[in-house]
Amino acid sequence: MLTSTTDIVQGRTIARYHGIVTAEVVYGTNALRDFFAGIRDLIGGRTGSYEQIFEKGHREAIAELTERAQKLGANGVIGVAVNTGTINIDDRGALLLITATGTAVTVD
């Protein structure tokens, strides 16, 4: 399945627009990982565990996005954007939210 952050595909014709597709991935935070991430932040290091979570989340969100586009009969998704955020659930933690959006299309 073709995926692109642009709204055109060079050398290809968009034969049909199927509509907007979205996908969401949500991860719970881990208190121990948060503790060590906080220490790394204080000393200026990178928080590799969170980087890995976001990388995994991006991959999973794109995979879900293309799966939903296929269900609409599309063979591509254009204008793909991935955003991240947090949802505070209480004073003990938060949820990490990764969303992907795009337009499902059929390209020739």
Curated annotation (Swiss-Prot):
What InterPro entries does this protein's entry cite?
Answer: UPF0145_dom_sf (IPR035439), UPF0145_YbjQ-like (IPR002765)
Coiled coil ranges: none
Q: Which Pfam families match?
A: YbjQ_1 (PF01906)
Which family does the similarity line name?
A: Belongs to the UPF0145 family.
* PANTHER family per record: UPF0145 PROTEIN YBJQ
The protein depicted here goes by the name UPF0145 protein sll118
Q: Which organism is it from?
A: Synechocystis sp. (strain ATCC 27184 / PCC 6803 / Kazusa)
Lineage start: Bacteria, Bacillati, Cyanobacteriota, Cyanophyceae, Synechococcales
